[in-house]
Amino acid sequence: MDNEDKISISAKEEKILSFWKEQDIFQKTLDNREGCPTFSFYDGPPFATGLPHYGHLLAGTIKDVVCRYASMDGHYVPRRFGWDCHGVPVEYEVEKSLGLTEPGAIERFGVANFNEECRKIVFRYADEWKYFVDRIGRWVDFSATWRTMDLSFMESVWWVFRSLYDQGLVYEGTKVVPFSTKLGTPLSNFEAGQNYKEVDDPSVVIKFALQDNQGFLLAWTTTPWTLVSNMALAVHPELTYVRIKDKESGDEYILGQESLPRWFPDRESYEWIGQLSGKSLVGQSYEPLFPYFQDKKELEAFRILPADFIEESEGTGIVHMAPAFGEADFFACQEHNVPLVCPVDNQGCYTAEVKDFVGEYIKSADKGIARRLKNENKLFYQGTVRHRYPFCWRTDSPLIYKAVNSWFVAVEKVKSKMLKANESIHWTPGHIKQGRFGKWLEGARDWAISRNRYWGTPIPIWRSDDGELLVIGSIQELEALSGQKIVDLHRHFIDEIEINQNGKSFRRIPYVFDCWFDSGAMPYAQNHYPFERAEETEACFPADFIAEGLDQTRGWFYTLTVIAAALFDQPAFKNVIVNGIILAEDGNKMSKRLNNYPSPKMIMDAYGADALRLYLLNSVVVKAEDLRFSDKGVESVLKQVLLPLSNALAFYKTYAELYGFDPKETDNIELAEIDCWILSSLYSLVGKTRESMSQYDLHAAVNPFVDFIEDLTNWYIRRSRRRFWDAEDSADRRAAFSTLYEVLVVFSKVIAPFIPFIAEDMYQQLRGETDPESVHLCDFPHVVLEKILPDLERKMQDIREIVALGHSLRKEHKLKVRQPLQNVYIVGSKERMEALAQVGSLIGEELNVKDVHFCSETPEYVTTLIKPNFRTLGKKVGNRLPEIQRALARLPQEQIRAFMHKGQMVVSLGEETISLDKEDITVSWASAEGFVARSSASFVAVLDCQLTEPLIMEGIARELVNKINTMRRNGKLHVSDRIAIRLHAPVIVQEAFALHKEYICEETLTTSVSVIDYKEGEEWDINGHAVSFVLERVER
């Protein structure tokens, strides 16, 4: 494709964008549907602190398709855009830009100053976002955007929180939660699940000495840094453990029996002492590894605890427990009154309690701790292990699990409501409902919603010195309690507000909400519910539709579900499309640093937004699978789908204008069979599209219309071309024009939601004066039942299957399509052969074969060969496969033909018989010399490849036509221009030209031919003969 084509595509789309804006078409679509049923849509809010990427464009395209379709299908579809403004993504950018990386730096800079800096950068890339949203062809209302940092939005978030609190679903507690040391704040479980990586970590086995020199317990860990906080060991009470003596060291070790070969693979290296049960170990005491917390021994520490979660598939069957740094450890130790110690600060550094490592980052201390244990003869094994480990989704730093005091939403209390809500949601793809999302709901944990950060919605809890709480649910309530006018709810406006009540002073707790809480409250907060627009909000809840990426099953989809189920015992949305992840072409994550992907702007400038949209929509990524992005794939969509469609429109326009066709004059038109077929295919497509869209299955909706473009361009128009060229104003020509006009107009409406630019371009070139101003103001087409002819569609499908089979035979055996052949034999069921007999000439034309023979039996020129399908049959018969192979080789052709008809056969193996189906057999063909054969799902085709002299001469004539018409196109001649030819060629080519002169001249609009004896003009290879032409336009 040349640069001129690319420029024209981009320029045409920009022109359509201008048309939409100048004529305010989006607003007109809303006005057009005012008073119609509302189709409610929630838009997942992006952060404008980063540039949009292909993932955003994909999700935006999916949303746009569904909303455009709903609008064309008779719904009022408001599409408000929203912005996520709070949280770590914004704070982190400000911290980096201002160098506020040290602990306490933000406080020294001033929370007010820091928050105002955050406010300044929130919309850093808003203009770029608007550009890309427009350029991809997505329609949203930027004039009515909602923002999570707006006063009205934040007040509604307070109302949501207060409502949860009033239901007893909010509590303060200490739990082990994912913790980002880079940010100094806890994260939610679903945030921790968003960024796992394969990493190499230490793998150590530690020797814990039992009291009174009773030997050592071996415990394995991948986090040596937690060993300074060890408070207990755990065994499974039902597992069997062993005591052995290491012959080299003389030390006695206790470990799980199943893990023994893992750590002592050499049986001769140890002496067996005996077995003991896990239950017998429970309660025994051991010596602390480090002296830092040995005083806790008096408080039930350093004992062996029972734990039924222990498995022997890895490790030693004995687990080291640091209750401040592991969720299972925390609960087990809490149950047995083991004290909690947490000598790690919010930056991940050891506190003064660990005096030998104070101030050192815990991950950096792993080697030093292992070295010390080795020096003290407490290290049994040291190595590395490769495993998946969670990283902070924003800073890309490793997370830890840490016991912190936090405020929680009691999600586990409403788990049954969430599961019930999920049952009523329609998921696309469907497996996510009970799979990824359903399983996540089943394992849902209480949600840590408090963050000790700055730029966010403050948690509206005021606490007195004696622990009494005031939970505020509105600005009016805060103003009444404080006596102050509230103009902003951010921390630096309300942190100093003190409430005095009943002789007590209340101050706000120093936390803001997890920004996912803002997102989950979006259905209500976007409308300032319940303070404003209550009726509108309730009427649009749950949303009819949402869409985001697969990662949001543990993000936005989840938080929406938590809050909606808790407050209203309903889902937040009825239908959801989940897309997969777009990767770079090499399979890696797209990375600016690696520069491993083309920019979206470059792709749209080169190939157009429609090509990008269709490439994404017609890929596995809309089925929640990963897509390796390829610019060649986008180019292929343009060249193989969109340009042929544009060419079909250009073909119609050229000849309709040439012959003055008026689409309003449809009287006395009798359609040809091929007209009826394309119209039937069109309205069948309308039905399929409607059905797929009702199921929110975009991939199923797109596939058929891509195939229809092939039907239209490569079959209907190509097969009907001569009808359009008819110089006389015949009824047949009018039928062809009328049919093609109807197809193009209706099809422009079918594709409008998916590829809106080319749809608009087609419609604008076809619409009449009284038609709606834009294709997007039209109704989506309805099925016209009387035009759907299933038998005709099946017959045409059979014809095309046969033609495709014949062409594949030609390609396989290097037989040019332009070389005529004498015979083709089509083998199929008697009924289908009888139905196809009347279209033999059509098949002959397509395959360039003189005689088409329809047979219910394979002709004598071909022998059918069958053998076992080893892949399927091997599973059924096992070692009897060779016997079956020999039996099949002995079968006569009559039995094989019977099998080909019935699809089943019985093979005798001695006294035993085995039934075989088509899937058990592979079929091939042995042909007599001069014949070739091949089969499809329904037919066998046998081509007679023998070339006679007349066939050879006609083949030369057809090649001449092809090359002359190629020169016409290259020479930019108009389709109606007449030409004169000067020809230099060998005698055989001259004879072929003379023999088929009338045909050649008619096909190329040639009026005269001169044979010259010298080379002139462009040279071509015509079936092995060198030929040169000169073409000259002839004035009429």
From Swiss-Prot:
**Any one of the GO BP annotations:** isoleucyl-tRNA aminoacylation
Provide the coiled-coil residue spans: none
The top EC class, named as a word, is ligase
Cellular compartments per GO CC: cytoplasm
Keywords of the record, alphabetical order, are: Aminoacyl-tRNA synthetase, ATP-binding, Cytoplasm, Ligase, Metal-binding, Nucleotide-binding, Protein biosynthesis, Zinc
- In chain numbering, motif 'KMSKS' region lies across 589-593
**Reaction equations catalysed:** tRNA(Ile) + L-isoleucine + ATP = L-isoleucyl-tRNA(Ile) + AMP + diphosphate
Where the record places motif 'HIGH' region is 46-56
Tell me which domain of life the UniProt entry assigns to the organism this sequence originates from. Bacteria
What are this entry's molecular-function GO terms? aminoacyl-tRNA deacylase activity; ATP binding; isoleucine-tRNA ligase activity; tRNA binding; zinc ion binding
Q: Where in the cell is it found?
A: Cytoplasm
Give residues annotated as binding ATP.
Answer: K592
Give the main location.
Answer: cytoplasm
Which HAMAP family does the entry link to? Answer: Ile_tRNA_synth_type2
Q: Which NCBIfam families match?
A: ileS (TIGR00392)
Q: What does this protein do?
A: Catalyzes the attachment of isoleucine to tRNA(Ile). As IleRS can inadvertently accommodate and process structurally similar amino acids such as valine, to avoid such errors it has two additional distinct tRNA(Ile)-dependent editing activities. One activity is designated as 'pretransfer' editing and involves the hydrolysis of activated Val-AMP. The other activity is designated 'posttransfer' editing and involves deacylation of mischarged Val-tRNA(Ile).
Which family does this protein fall into?
Answer: Belongs to the class-I aminoacyl-tRNA synthetase family. IleS type 2 subfamily.
Per its record, how is this protein called by name?
Isoleucine--tRNA ligase
Q: Which organism is it from?
A: Chlamydia trachomatis serovar A (strain ATCC VR-571B / DSM 19440 / HAR-13)
Lineage of the organism: Bacteria, Pseudomonadati, Chlamydiota, Chlamydiia, Chlamydiales
Q: Which gene encodes it?
A: ileS
